[in-house]
UniProtKB/Swiss-Prot annotation:
Further comment found in the protein's record: Present with 40600 molecules/cell in log phase SD medium.
Modified residues (Phosphothreonine): T294, T298
Domain ENTH stretches: 1-127
Pfam families, per database record: ANTH, I_LWEQ
MF-aspect GO terms: actin filament binding; clathrin adaptor activity; clathrin light chain binding; phosphatidylinositol-3,4-bisphosphate binding; phosphatidylinositol-3,5-bisphosphate binding
Residues with PTM Phosphoserine: S308, S555
GO BP: actin cortical patch assembly; actin filament organization; clathrin coat assembly; endocytosis; negative regulation of Arp2/3 complex-mediated actin nucleation
Encoding gene (name): SLA2
Bias (Polar residues): 311-324
Name of this protein: Protein SLA2
Source organism phylogeny: Eukaryota, Fungi, Dikarya, Ascomycota, Saccharomycotina
Transmembrane annotation, as ranges: 772-791
């Protein structure tokens, strides 16, 4: 590598450093001078390709700035070399595909450079990167005015692209207040290029107007004139924005345009002195001619001030880019005239041979007059623009002062509002403190009442008489105290586990007896305390409601004032819907973690897989509807579809969690059960994250494309978690030895189930005046109606599918197996209920049948009914009448089972109360009382231990029953 090439490489490295500063002018100038010295720019492009500048966004952006300046001010070979390397320049825009500010600027910069190179490749008359009017002299002999019209259109399109890119740069500068020097430096070549294009379009439109010079021609040029005026307004705003950047004004002098666009149709004597003639091209053979030797103009060396601000005296010798240079002198004009003459002779040799010698003198005079006219117009425009710029600066300062005053007023108003809200908050705190004191007083009164009641226990006979008198009064008040009783009952149920733990930790029987006596005293006194508690509660509730209403009124006023300042009303609604879905999933996860055992029917793995498919489809539909809402906008989008999808997705996920627990806990070993439940929790947690990612607080700060990406990524994560759960459940299908074929028709299975239930219940239609038997027959009738409704659902599915029903069942084999399993579960549970009722009829005095058997059988029927309804809901339509009827029949079965259970529990309580009345207790001595109490506690512990063992035994029986069912 030679020393010159080494210096070139060093200059490019320093110009494209990693610091976020503007490329230094001396390094860029070294590259430009290299192209003029060697009359070639191939080495510059080769060095740019070999240097690792594309790895860093800042270096790549600075490389594009350097490349743009080399194309503008370098040797014409730089433009030709850049046109050949358009594919390489286009590939630079795909290097960094991220969402950072520099990545977007790089893509837009590459897009603009490619458009510029395409323009130069199509219009070879522009032999340099700038758009000076003098450089287009070689195009004055274009054969067709249409080509000039097309050239103006292409230049205007390029000017629009330049304006769009400059707006993107300003937006990036405003978003990042620090380290904007590098981005500001990209505006320097854009200012020069935009002004060159503007000057050329102005001159070209005037020439076209002179050439056509009729009403029809002006009508044809009217669209170009309107677009020219629009571009003039945008260019004026662009230069005004550039003037507001102090750092940019130290680097380059901003052009000053008039407020109104110049009239390109205005013709004066100076304009008529120079016309661009458009002639029809005639095919002819070019005769041999003597090439005219024309002087080669010296390449322009455009000096630009350094990055650091310097005094004015030091910048007098340096000029900005081409648009700030003065117009060519008479000598320069004389140098360019032979070039135009040579170009004209090259294109029209026959016409040149016929021209008289004085034509060239007239042509030279016309060019000189045109140059003088353009110089005068430029000086006038600069003076007008200077005055307009000063007026604009004054208006800008006044607007800024008004804005500051308005901000101060708003700040004072906000401060006053904050003080008012603070005072209101202090008042509310004082009021709440008064309520706390009142509650403490009530608690002290309750303690006093407890002590008083303990003293009154001495006379039990008098107390029993008083309680008997008050019993009638409390019975009348029982209905009004039902809600309070349910709350106390819930508290009592919550205290039972703690009470059991405390019983195990009791060190002596005496302490347990004392605690029991205290509890009995409290229970006996609750009725006495209840009246005053209710009064105090009502009084406190009334005061609390009054304060809440006042607080709500204040908050409503504040909310109304805040809502008037915002237009986004849909975000809270969507957040509430998403939160409801999150709550549904959280409740299912809570039930999953609950230690209560599953008492419903056994769920087969095929049914779980069908639920997985339904959940996956609902998740995809939810993602699609949410993306559609983002694309259409909150105001014009379909919000109802999103709400339905959220409900369906959360409900299907909750159903999947519940049935997964049923299958894992009752069927699988502990290790596999924990594995399945862990995967189910991951799916539920992922669904919850899915909803949380779509909350407005997470989406307000991003654009629509990023929002759709978030939705798609969340859906992909959700599908991955569901796929993991599906892969974990599918091996369990191999464990089963399913006898029935997948082509089994669920429709025929449901019909067989209904016939079986009807035939089994025919021998029960006897006139037996037993309430249990009547309730059992009611459940059987409801189950028969349920199965018939399920058959109607299958018939409806057959009418909605375009393929035969058998093929539909074969295609959805997992759902088919789940539906068949649900039908068999209904038949089995109903058969157990019928068997229990038969034993009740055949046995004498119900020796072999207990009422508890009816409760168990009815619960099995209700659980299997729920499984059948859930399996049928998977493939039915949303507003299916048959499905609504099926769910109504399921509700009837559940109500009948609940009635049977309530009746049996009433019988048990009656028998228990009768047995207690038949065996009176002896409380004559304290020893007998304590002995009876200890015996009763021992009996309770035995029953609890028996209950625990029975539950464990029930789990083992269900697990073995599941595997035996699979073997069958």
């Amino acid at each position: 590598m030679s020393r010159i090439d080494s210096d070139l490489q060093k200059a490019l490295k320093k110009a494209c450093s990693v610091e976020e500063t503007a490329p230094k002018r001396k390094h860029v100038r070294a590259c430009i001078v290299y192209t003029w010295d060697h009359q070639s720019s191939k080495a510059v492009f080769t060095t740019l390709k070999t240097l690792p500048l594309a790895n860093d966004e800042v270096q790549l952006f600075k490389m594009l700035i350097v490349l743009h300046k080399i194309i503008q001010e370098g040797h014409p070979s730089a433009l030709a070399e850049a046109i050949r390397d358009r594919d390489w320049i286009r590939s630079l825009g795909r290097v960094h595909s991220g969402g950072s500010s520099y990545s977007k600027l790089i893509r837009e910069y590459v897009r603009y450079l490619v458009l510029k190179l395409d323009f130069h490749a199509h219009h070879r008359g522009f032999n340099n990167g700038t758009f000076e009017y003098e450089e287009y002299v070689s195009l004055v002999s274009v054969s067709d005015p249409d080509e000039g019209y097309e050239t103006i259109l292409d230049l205007m399109s390029l000017q629009d692209s330049l304006d769009e890119f400059s707006q993107i740069i300003f937006a990036s500068i405003q978003s990042e207040r620090r380290n904007t020097e590098c981005k500001i430096s990209a505006l320097i070549p854009l200012i020069a290029e935009s002004y060159g294009i503007y000057k050329f379009i102005t001159s070209m439109l005037r020439a076209m107007h002179r050439q056509l010079n009729d009403a029809e021609g002006d009508a044809a040029l009217q669209p170009l004139k309107e677009r020219y005026e629009l571009q003039h307004a945008r260019l004026f705003e662009f230069y005004a924005d550039c003037s507001s950047v102090k750092y940019l004004t130290t680097l380059v002098t901003i052009p000053k345009l008039p407020v109104d666009a110049p009239d390109v149709f205005l013709i004066n004597d100076v304009d008529e002195s120079k016309e661009i003639k458009f002639k029809k091209r005639e095919p002819s053979v070019t005769p041999a001619r003597t090439p005219a030797r024309t002087p080669t103009p010296t390449p322009p060396v455009v000096a630009e001030p350094a990055i650091s601000p310097r005094p004015v005296s030091q910048r007098t010798t340096s000029t900005p880019t081409g648009y700030l240079q003065t117009m060519p002198t008479g000598a320069t004009t004389g140098m360019m005239i032979p070039t135009a003459t040579g170009a004209a002779n090259a294109i029209f040799p026959q016409a040149t041979a016929q021209m008289q010698p004085d034509f060239w003198a007239n042509q030279q005079a016309q060019f000189a007059n045109e140059q003088n006219r353009l110089e005068q117009e430029r000086v006038q425009q600069l003076q007008q623009q200077q005055a307009q710029q000063e007026l604009f600066q004054q208006q800008l300062q006044k607007a800024q002062q008004d804005m500051m005053n308005m901000q101060l007023q708003q700040q004072n108003q906000h401060q006053n509002d904050l003080i008012a809200l603070t005072n209101q908050y202090e008042k509310d705190q004082a009021l709440l403190q008064q309520y706390d004191q009142r509650v403490q007083q009530l608690e002290s009164e309750i303690t006093t009442m407890d002590s008083t009641a303990s003293k009154q226990l001495a006379n039990k006979d008098e107390q029993l008489t008083a309680l008997q008198d008050q019993l009638d009064v409390w019975e009348r008040k029982y209905e009004s105290l039902a809600k309070l009783y349910s709350q106390l009952r819930q508290e009592h149920l919550n205290l039972l586990p703690r009470f059991k733990k405390l019983q195990l930790k009791v060190n002596s029987a005496q302490e347990s007896i004392q605690k029991k006596e205290q509890l009995e005293h409290k229970l006996k006194q609750k009725d006495l305390q209840m009246a005053e508690l209710v009064k105090d509660r009502d009084r406190a509730r009334l005061e609390l409601e009054r304060s809440i209403n006042n607080a709500e009124a204040d908050s409503a006023a504040a909310t109304a004032a805040a809502e008037t300042m915002t237009q986004d009303k849909m975000n809270p609604i969507l957040d509430a819907i998403l939160e409801s879905g999150i709550n549904t999933i959280q409740e299912s996860v809570y039930n999953l973690d609950s230690p209560l055992s599953w008492s419903g029917p056994l769920t087969p793995p095929t049914f779980l897989l069908s639920l997985l498919e339904s959940t996956s489809e609902n998740a995809t539909e939810f993602a699609t509807s949410f993306n559609n809402l983002i694309v259409d906008g909150l105001a014009h989008g379909d919000q109802t579809e999103v709400i339905h999808c959220v409900s369906d997705f959360s409900t299907s996920m909750a159903t999947l969690v519940t049935n997964s627990k049923a299958y894992a806990v009752t069927t699988l070993p502990q290790e596999q059960s924990d594995q399945i439940l862990t995967l189910v929790k991951r799916c539920a947690r992922e669904a919850q994250y899915f909803f949380e990612d779509l909350m407005s607080e997470n989406l307000n700060q991003v654009g629509d494309e990023e929002k759709t990406d978030i939705v798609i990524n969340a859906n992909v994560d959700m599908q991955e978690k569901l796929q993991e759960l599906s892969l974990a459940i599918e091996p369990l299908l191999n464990i089963q030895s399913v006898k029935s074929n997948k082509e089994t028709n669920p429709h025929s299975e449901l019909v067989a189930t209904a016939d079986k239930i009807v035939k089994s219940s025919e021998h029960l239609r006897v006139d037996v005046p037993k309430p249990l038997l009547s309730l059992a027959l009611m459940i059987i009738d409801a189950v028969v109606a349920l199965v018939k409704a399920a058959i109607q659902c299958q018939n409806e599915i057959a009418t909605t599918t375009s393929i035969p029903l058998n093929q539909f069942y074969l295609k959805n084999s997992r759902w088919t197996e789940g539906l068949i399993s649900a039908a068999k579960a209904v038949a089995g549970a109903t058969n157990v209920l019928i068997t229990t009722a038969s034993k009740l009829i055949t046995s004498e005095d119900n020796e072999n049948t207990s009422p508890e058997q009816f409760i168990v059988a009815s619960k099995e029927v209700a659980a299997s009914t729920i499984q059948l309804v859930a399996a049928s809901r998977v493939k039915t339509s949303i507003h299916s009448k048959a499905q609504d009827k099926l769910e109504h029949c399921s509700k009837d079965v559940t109500d009948a089972c609940r009635s049977l259970g309530n009746h049996v529990m009433g019988m048990i309580e009656d028998d228990h109360s009768t047995s207690q009345q038949q065996q009176p207790l002896d409380f004559t001595s304290e020893h007998t009382l304590k002995t009876a109490e200890m015996e009763q506690q021992v009996e309770i512990l035995k029953l609890e231990q028996s209950l625990s063992n029975a539950r464990k035994r029930l789990g083992e029986i269900r697990r073995h029953a599941y595997y035996n069912q699979d073997d069958d």
